Amino acid sequence: MTPLSSPLSQYWQTVVERLPEGFTETSLSAQAKSVLTFSDFALDSVIAHPEWLAELESASPQADEWRHYAGWLQEALAGVCDDASLMRELRFFRRRIMVRIAWAQTLSLVDDETILQQLSHLAETLIVGARDWLYAACCREWGTPCNPQGVPQPLLILGMGKLGGGELNFSSDIDLIFAWPEHGETRGGRRELDNAQFFTRLGQRLIKALDQPTMDGFVYRVDMRLRPFGDSGPLVLSFAALEDYYQEQGRDWERYAMVKARLMGDNDDAWSRELRAMLRPFVFRRYIDFSVIQSLRNMKGMIAREVRRRGLKDNIKLGAGGIREIEFIVQVFQLIRGGREPSLQSRSLLPTLDAIAALHLLPENDVAQLRVAYLFLRRLENLLQSINDEQTQTLPADDLNRARLAWGMKAENWPQLVGELTDHMANVRRVFNELIGDDEADTPQEEERSEPWREVWQDALQEDDSTPVLAHLADEDRRQVLTLIADFRKELDKRPIGPRGRQVLDQLMPHLLADVCSREDAAVTLSRITPLLAGIVTRTTYLELLSEFPGALKHLIMLCAASPMIASQLARYPLLLDELLDPGTLYQPTATDAYRDELRQYLLRVPEEDEEQQLEALRQFKQAQLLRIAAADIAGTLPVMKVSDHLTWLAEAMIDAVVQQAWTQMVARYGQPAHLDERQGRGFAVVGYGKLGGWELGYSSDLDLIFLHDCPMDVMTNGEREIDGRQFYLRLAQRIMHLFSTRTSSGILYEVDARLRPSGAAGMLVTSADAFADYQQHEAWTWEHQALVRARVVYGDPQLTSQFDTVRRTIMTTARDGKTLQTEVREMREKMRAHLGNKHRDRFDIKADEGGITDIEFIAQYLVLRYAHEKPKLTRWSDNVRILELLAQNGIMDEHEAQALTVAYTTLRDELHHLALQELPGHVAQTCFSKERALVQASWRKWLVAV
């Protein structure tokens, strides 16, 4: 055993002062002294439980003692009689065994591979022990779940990630997926439940038993987001549902996750074999799967972006050359060749590395270096986490913990440890880059082209100076360019830029100036780019990105030249520069039906319990997607209606994620309303009005939302902090509004307007579906019925969605007096014009003026309310373009007029989109769009003025 270093020997005196009575310095062994000095977690634990220290001193932990965990836990749970005592015993057991593992690890009594094995077996033992106890308790309450043949059905648990691979770290959370075999009902209980309900309740109780913090702490943080559909999917799925999902919708990243999936507990029964056989074809393809390479390249980019996004310079997991990259290297070979090479199908990393060497897929020396680096990094990670039982992979900044880690890693001091760490991570990074490296480099021709611009940048020319490379520009443009460069250099003098930043900037600027100044609009483009550069000069990683990836620089210049809005967004949120790396995705927005899945994958990288990071991630995802939509718009690959479709689908994905987060937070605090025990879903819906409801969102549109629930009176929640069910839904809606509007470093998510709810701002924020129906039937004004034309459910379970659709259809198909309706709609439009009228008399306001977008919307709404009682099909759609189609198809409006209004409408909306990209207000010269305006005005007179 290595003697304590000088700093730790000094710290030992602080430890002595904390020891309880009966513990004397002389009574403790050198081993105990070392462990208690190294780990505050171990010290706190033995202070609370002195008998554990006596146990450790008399019999040191053994390498194979994990074989006894199940028996020890069974003894501990023998006297458990309820959920509360179960939770207490689980926490007590976990802490006791973790102290033993920390002892063995700190003193190197067992090797590092065995430590990983012990940590994984401990988690599996606790998961299975809790599941089995709770399964029996649930069967006593509701009966045993059986298939139609009466065969009892078990809950199977897939351990994912490091748990599945037997490589869990000291303070890891656990990723799980729950499944059960076949549908059926419970038998022999006080009341019958279908199997889905039984296993959902069992799953909820199991998560609570493991995850919920109590005075004794928690067992493990449980993350269920890897299950099909993530947080929005069922908590537990049948085998059939799992098979359907992975066959029809399984994504590449879910294949990567499933490589390590392992069934927890005794898993050689028929059900377990069936589940494994079902999943294997999804993970390992029978052929050599080179199609995965591009997906893996994308993953590499995601890793790099995460490192930049979170500033992970000292992170041994996610930083360059860290644990994640070793895992990635191994998965490359598993996913490409695993279907043909069974030896690559191991869930654990080290055996798979051996197989890679045996198959000669990597040089022996590379494999040897990866193995040594992996064990070094995993030991360092576990020691770091065992100091405070804290889930971290970031190297400490304080001297005490640095001294602890240096001693634990058998280094003389911290600099020596950092040197060893740097060497290991450099070896990993080299293999990682060689495997799928695609970095771009300058050609000699590019270097030659940029040389004259190096002089322009470094010589600090004055605006009246002449230089041949700017001779092609007009005099005024040349002066502006030189002034912009000079002003930018002055701005740099005010910034704390280090030597590395200066060096990268001096490499970047000649290339940037060469590209910008070859354009006719050089001065305008440079004026948009220099504020962005000024914002990132102290963040060298972003300068390096633009310097090392010429393609990204070219896209930056093109987009900033085309749109000041994009330039402003990039300057405000430099994280978006990562999106410029891949033109394949930059100009091809996410498929409209894939936003939810993309967002779910993005959020998986953020701890579920870290609300601040979750809020940031939502905003960053939205901004990245907005950039891609705008880039495609500028490139002409998205017509106006498709732009709005993408913006709308993106907003719906955001609403879905925000509701999921708010729901999770509320249920953790209060439980869920008890009426949900008898039905599927959450009894909650979000209705989108206006541009969201009509699939017509613009780049800066806010969201018009109302919230509905179906909670009966006198229902309470079922959590420890019980509240009224309707109060729960009110707080849920308030939480949703908060998550949307909270300003983080990445701004707000959306402005949300909930004033279209019954009784407007004076009404309740969330309304019962029955009260909403009654209000619409008896109290709503005509303008509220107009608004209902453009309303639809954007989040909600099928039951509430159906209720809302019925109310909407009933209101819209109510027979109305044509003359009265005409007058009310016309007067409302006149009020709007008076209130929101154009302040620029010499300009045409595209939305608000006569002949503009709002007039077309009012015509469509009027005709639906006027004729839907005769033609109920008019209620089908909520967007203006398809409403105009329906009016023509149902003989209300002449087909030529409907088509002309549609063209006018899309033309005007297209102009609004483009004005937004230019950061210009929504008005143009009076001479613009005269043909479209005349056509709209004629239709207005025909339908809303003529008798």
Curated annotation (Swiss-Prot):
InterPro entries: GlnE, GlnE_rpt_dom, NT_sf, PII_UdlTrfase/GS_AdlTrfase. PANTHER family: BIFUNCTIONAL GLUTAMINE SYNTHETASE ADENYLYLTRANSFERASE_ADENYLYL-REMOVING ENZYME, GLUTAMINE SYNTHETASE ADENYLYLTRANSFERASE. One of its GO terms (molecular function) is [glutamate-ammonia-ligase] adenylyltransferase activity. Involved in the regulation of glutamine synthetase GlnA, a key enzyme in the process to assimilate ammonia. When cellular nitrogen levels are high, the C-terminal adenylyl transferase (AT) inactivates GlnA by covalent transfer of an adenylyl group from ATP to specific tyrosine residue of GlnA, thus reducing its activity. Conversely, when nitrogen levels are low, the N-terminal adenylyl removase (AR) activates GlnA by removing the adenylyl group by phosphorolysis, increasing its activity. Its cofactor is Mg(2+). It catalyses: [glutamine synthetase]-O(4)-(5'-adenylyl)-L-tyrosine + phosphate = [glutamine synthetase]-L-tyrosine + ADP; [glutamine synthetase]-L-tyrosine + ATP = [glutamine synthetase]-O(4)-(5'-adenylyl)-L-tyrosine + diphosphate. This is Bifunctional glutamine synthetase adenylyltransferase/adenylyl-removing enzyme. Residues 1-440 are annotated as: Adenylyl removase. Belongs to the GlnE family. Gene3D superfamilies: 1.20.120.1510, Beta Polymerase, domain 2, Glutamine synthase adenylyltransferase GlnE, Nucleotidyltransferases domain 2. Residues 450-947 are annotated as: Adenylyl transferase. SUPFAM superfamilies: Nucleotidyltransferase, Nucleotidyltransferase substrate binding subunit/domain. GO terms for cellular component: cytosol. Its EC number is 2.7.7.89, 2.7.7.42.
